[in-house]
Amino acid sequence: MKDLARYRNIGIFAHVDAGKTTTTERILKLTGQIHKTGEVHDGESTTDFMEQEAERGITIQSAAVSCFWKDHRFNVIDTPGHVDFTVEVYRSLKVLDGGIGVFCGSGGVEPQSETNWRYANDSEVARIIFVNKLDRMGADFYRVVDQTKKVLGANPLVMVLPIGIEDDFVGVVDLLTRKAFIWDDTGLPENYEITDVPADMVDKVEEYREMLIETAVEQDDDLMMAYMDGEEPSMEDIKRCIRKGTRTMDFFPTYCGSAFKNKGVQNILDAVVDYLPSPTEVDPQPLTDEEGEPNGKYAIVSPDETFKALAFKITDDRFGALTFVRIYSGTLKKGDTILNAATGKTERIGRMCEMQADDRNELTSAQAGDIIAIVGMKSNVQTGHTLCDPKDPIILEAMVFPEPVISISVTPKDKGSTEKMGLAIGKMVAEDPTFRVETDQDSGETILSGMGELHLDIKVDILKRTYGVELEVGEPQVAYRETITQEVEDSYTHKKQSGGSGQFGKIDYRIKPGEPNSGFTFSSVVVGGNVPKEFFPAIEKGFASMMESGVLAGFPVLDVEVELYDGGFHAVDSSAVAFEIAAKGAFRQSIPKAGPQLIEPIMKVDVFTPDDHVGDVIGDLNRRRGMIKDQEAGVTGVRVKADIPLSEMFGYIGSLRTMTSGRGQFSMEFSHYSPCPNNVAEKVIADTKERNAKK
């Protein structure tokens, strides 16, 4: 039986280029999983094994690797930092027990760091902080620590102090032991010596050590009283308090170093062992009923329970179809039969393995706490599906993903590519819940939808290079929506008589604007039997089906509330079909009276620009209908936050590079829908109608 207290399921996440993947590489090197460390800038890293990742120097998928440190098993997930791939971060957080937040020593708390930190807070994932790249020009450990307080609202618990900075960075002082770890210039992680604290740092070390202990003992009233009386707690007691406060997210143990230069990585590994929780120390996953509502039961983390697991990632690589699974309860053995609770199908487990990024070790069994990959599942398993014991069917809390905001049309160039594309897209949709595909009913074109330009760019690249599909790609299209602005009280009667039994359904209703992000809601206040209750579902279905296409330009309709308050029926001619048709007619009749309005996706944009280009960048954002929300001066430039319509952001990366001589950076994520200005709405509606007329 494996000792779950020695398990650590952790994720590494941060902003693009803060050094997540390099940190992961160094962890694997130190734990003996790889013998030659690959470099991101050389396109050789272990966890970035897709062609697109190696070329772009960014992580797109979450790669899972297993390794060991001081008799503890680590399951490590290296997640993407680019906002278009935030879904990978989200679904990884769902199955992790702890994390390492990596921040750039010079860049500080960057936009995607903030987003990932917020997601981790929502998922209640305990973390340690690693301030990386202290050997870089402009690096400042203390400034980044301060930023984590101001920008993230975090409480960093400083555990080490840097010795030197930039080119003079040589190591760290461990505050608890008052020992200095100094590495030589060979770049080898094992080439370091432990010495006394440098004389010029003694006072600062004592100051920060006192703050560390004061914060830690707040977790234990007796220890705190003893400390206030002048008694220093034992090392064991301090570590116990730090572990407790880390698990409850009262603070975040904070380290520093240079992953690239192999300085300070051992301290992180020790911190993962000492302070991050094991699978048995986090809140168990809740179970739900078929409607997704919590039922008060939980997946207890124990190998003795019945099998319960969550499929959190589907991928197709050179080994075939892989389903990544976090086992919460029970044990899974080769040859066992399991149930996919979402599809109702059972399946016999053939092969399963633990992953070493793009390599794997075959397993005969796995248990609660493990993150594994099952090979070649046949039950149409998708991300978020619950896998369980057929004798004890359960449903784990679902994973919810954001809706796509941008679309492109793709057309295969020949028949061979058409067949390849169909197979490829089926696999890609299973792998990525934020990647959607539909066929335009009028033109027959295939429409790909995703989270941003880079997201779709990567998907098209995969279709072309991985699957050999020859494609013509259309211009990006914004996911406009329609809504209403006024309340309408109305009545509609559907009546049809053509020999034999006819059709009759009369409804009296109110249509009004719903709450933001409410979608479609239906309610009934009918008193008496004017409209029998058995017809309510048909009426709701009729209205809901019409929400897919609005009256302005055929865009889906958002945030509409329908209240049925009266109506009429015929004992012979009324039926569910008749009332469903009545509801559809009512929608067509009343929506034009309710002040229909075109709304557009607004993006939360975060731009970094050098000081000498701030005016140009802000002027450009204003021309893009941007609303500046905040400006924050940093050491190397200015960070500008703004809300900007997605339609104005196409090609922005090129414009920003031109304005800032290649030094500017930006990220964006969907924020909300907002009404289009009249001139914009008129043009969008006219262009859409013209485009539809040509189909």
From Swiss-Prot:
Gene3D superfamilies: 3.30.230.10, 3.30.70.240, Elongation Factor G (Translational Gtpase), domain 3 (3.30.70.870), P-loop containing nucleotide triphosphate hydrolases (3.40.50.300), Translation factors (2.40.30.10)
Domain of life from the UniProt record: Bacteria
Annotated transmembrane regions: none
Record-level GO cellular component terms: cytoplasm
InterPro entries: EFG_II, EFG_III, EFG_III/V, EFG_IV, EFG_V, EFG_V-like, EFTu-like_2, G_TR_CS
Locations listed in the record: Cytoplasm
Gene Ontology terms describing biological process: ribosome disassembly
UniProtKB keywords: Cytoplasm, Elongation factor, GTP-binding, Nucleotide-binding, Protein biosynthesis
GO molecular function: GTP binding; GTPase activity; guanosine tetraphosphate binding; translation elongation factor activity
Entry keyword Protein biosynthesis: yes
Keyword RNA-binding appears in the UniProt entry: no
Chief place where the protein resides: cytoplasm
Binding site residues for GTP: 14-21, 78-82, 132-135
Pfam families: EFG_C, EFG_III, EFG_IV, GTP_EFTU, GTP_EFTU_D2
Stretches assigned to the tr-type G domain: 5-280
Family as reported in the entry's similarity comment: Belongs to the TRAFAC class translation factor GTPase superfamily. Classic translation factor GTPase family. EF-G/EF-2 subfamily.
Role: Catalyzes the GTP-dependent ribosomal translocation step during translation elongation. During this step, the ribosome changes from the pre-translocational (PRE) to the post-translocational (POST) state as the newly formed A-site-bound peptidyl-tRNA and P-site-bound deacylated tRNA move to the P and E sites, respectively. Catalyzes the coordinated movement of the two tRNA molecules, the mRNA and conformational changes in the ribosome.
HAMAP family: EF_G_EF_2_B
Protein name, UniProt field: Elongation factor G 1
Taxonomic path: Bacteria, Pseudomonadati, Pseudomonadota, Gammaproteobacteria, Alteromonadales
